[in-house]
Regions:
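Short hydrophobic alpha-helices and adjacent helix-cap/hinge residues
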Residues: 1-326
Length: 326
């Protein structure tokens, strides 16, 4: 073979050499759709947990993943259209949270993998046939929704034994609320307490909801897990403090002045979502990824608030707390 022909052969063959033997081509950029139920600002901590999890698995925005965000800003009716936008943008995987978010995502596609970062019982809501074998294109994480809401009543009653009229904020737009209410009514009966429910469909309803509960002699307050109420927990906690109402909600609420918090650790749920994304991007089908249940729960007591309300928290309850705020 002539020298010139040999050089041509070598140069032409280089294009077929394996990647390790060539200059690395640009890595594939996976497109991730994020369907948020409220706003980015209200879920900053959770989104950072997701990004941290992805980074630990080798995924970084601007390098090998691009995340396209859509937020419904608390308007659940916008979710289907936002989900459709993400699906149309040719994403590789769709992330969302809550039952309304999961339903909108599921209705938008039966092909693109969906990972639910946190939702109530996905089986009872009809989104999957079973936790062990979700089938279809949806998997993710769930938490003991109704049980958490009912447990809050037990805890606030333990902290405030004299409370017999327990107020509950409910967003009727969230279909998961009914199962939680059923469990809470059962628990209230066992505690010999009356449950006073008030609907909160939007942020503007919160002040009026407080006025309604205080006029009915409410002695303690909680709410049914819902993205709208969760994202406004600090505001609700501040109003509870102003109205001298012992309240139990989640961690941001306790940090903002609520007496107590009991909830699944949302940071952990969003962080764990990254592992589902990794497996799906590497070829595992959602139907082959069993749904995980929340593993971390937090009990937090704000002793500063207890003092301000003139309450003495029982020592056994303090001993069970994961965190004390004083």
């Amino acid at each position: 073979m002539r020298r010139r022909d040999f050089i041509k052969f070598i140069l032409g063959s280089a294009a077929a050499w394996p990647l390790p033997l060539r200059a690395q081509q640009a890595a594939k950029v996976y497109r991730i759709g994020y369907l948020g139920v409220t706003t980015h600002a209200e879920y900053t901590r959770e989104i950072e947990a997701l990004l941290n999890g992805l980074r630990q698995l080798g995924y970084e925005e601007g390098k090998n993943i691009a995340i396209d965000y859509r937020f419904a800003k608390g308007d659940y009716e916008r979710l289907p259209a936002l989900a459709a936008e993400l699906v149309a943008s040719k994403i590789d995987v769709l992330l969302t949270h809550s039952t309304p978010g999961a339903r909108a995502a599921r209705q938008s596609t039966s092909i693109i993998p969906i990972v639910v970062m946190a939702a109530a019982d996905l089986v009872s809501s009809g989104l999957v046939p079973s936790i062990a074998r979700p089938g279809g294109n949806l998997t993710g994480l769930t938490f003991f929704f109704a049980e958490i809401c009912a447990k809050r009543l037990e805890l606030i009653k333990e902290a405030v034994p004299g409370a017999t009229r327990l107020g509950v904020f409910v967003n009727p737009a969230n279909p998961s609320g009914e199962a939680a209410l059923t469990a809470m009514r059962r628990t209230a009966r066992s505690l010999r307490a009356e449950l006073l429910t008030v609907n909160v469909r939007a942020v503007d309803d919160i002040a009026g909801a407080f006025a309604m509960l205080t006029s009915r002699g409410t002695q303690a307050l909680t709410f049914i897990e819902d993205p709208l109420l969760i994202s406004n927990t600090p505001h609700i906690a501040q109003l509870a403090t102003q109205n001298r109402l012992p309240m139990i909600g989640d961690k941001p609420g306790a940090e903002a002045g609520a007496l107590m918090a009991y909830a699944a650790d949302r940071y952990d749920l969003w962080f764990r979502t990254a592992f589902f994304v990794d497996k799906i991007l590497k070829g595992t089908q959602p139907k082959d990824l069993p749904i995980e249940q929340a593993a971390k729960f937090e009990l937090i007591i704000n002793l500063k608030t207890a003092k301000a309300l003139g309450l003495t928290i029982p020592l056994p309850l303090i001993a069970r707390a994961d965190e004390l705020i004083d």
